[in-house]
Amino acid sequence: MNSKKVNWIFLSLILLNMLMYVLMLVCYVQGILLFEMNILVNLLLAQLVMMLPAILFALAFRRKTETGHLNEMLGFHKIRVSSFFMIFLFTYLIMPLTTALNAISMLFVENEVTAISGDVLQMPFPVMLFMIGMFGPFCEEFVFRGVIFRGYKNSGPVFWSIFWSALLFGLMHLNFNQAAYAVAIGILFGLLVEATGSLWSSVIAHMIFNSHQVCLMYLSDLFQADLAAAEEALTQEMLIAAIGPYLIIAAVATPLAVCVLVWLAKNERREAEFCSIWACRKMKKEAMVSIPLIIAIVISLAYMSLEWILALL
């Protein structure tokens, strides 16, 4: 697997998403309902569409030197128990940064998570905790920190492999709100994988992050808080006032998260690999950007822009 194959994977992923949206729209207009569409079906279809091209490409274009099982090829290595608990700390330390980025994006676009909260809350808590908090994160990490990141890593410096896999992770969400903080999460999770040497670390962190959001959503509902109505009541001035404190907290918490990454690298005996991320950033192997990647990025940004413009009308 290399960058060229990875770029085709992402283009396939985006095109499949577009095809799914068109088919669903046609079925809705024509009154054709093969099954009841709800948030659960939407989430399941989205993950399957994302996983399909990644699995097919990973199996079909596995390098001759990669003779092990797929889980070994993608970096599903064991981590120490102490590292497992420090990943919890790392995940909560990066939350102020993601919250601040989310709030900044809300100055311009709608909060996508809040927008679907009503649909989510109609489902049983255990079902949504599994789908959003466990299944979704596993699929996304398998694709972006597994197949895509490692494909780029075979072609270029780790520094740029982390950047490109994070950028594509953000674009995959196909909306500016989630993309704003998904890119930051992607970079931090990429660093986490390099610090521990295991894809399980980012899977665990992603599960903690999403599960935390799901729990907050249901707790708010338990206390009769209407998230959608609360967001509509937010003014620009209120958002700007909230961003400041979050940025201050993030300015303290994010460096601490980096310290945790350094500790994890030492704990997993990967100090040399982790330190080389920045040192080897100018090393060149193969071109990481190709025509399929450019096409995929243009399609993603065009869709996101169109959705944003339509929301303003």
PLM feature spans:
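Hydrophobic residues within alpha-helical transmembrane segments
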Residues: 15, 45, 135, 164-168, ...
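Small-polar-interrupted transmembrane alpha-helices in polytopic inner-membrane proteins
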Residues: 157-177, 186, 207
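C-terminal membrane module of polytopic membrane proteins
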Residues: 211-313
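Juxtamembrane helix-loop-helix connectors linking adjacent transmembrane helices
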Residues: 33-43, 70-139, 154, 302-313
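Functionally important transmembrane alpha-helices
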Residues: 23-26, 178-242
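Interfacial transmembrane-helix boundary/kink motif in multi-pass membrane proteins
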Residues: 2-18, 41, 67-97, 241-244, ...
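Membrane-interface helix/loop boundary segments of multi-pass membrane proteins
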Residues: 139-164, 191-198
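Alpha-helical transmembrane segments in multi-pass membrane proteins
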Residues: 17-62, 245-254, 313
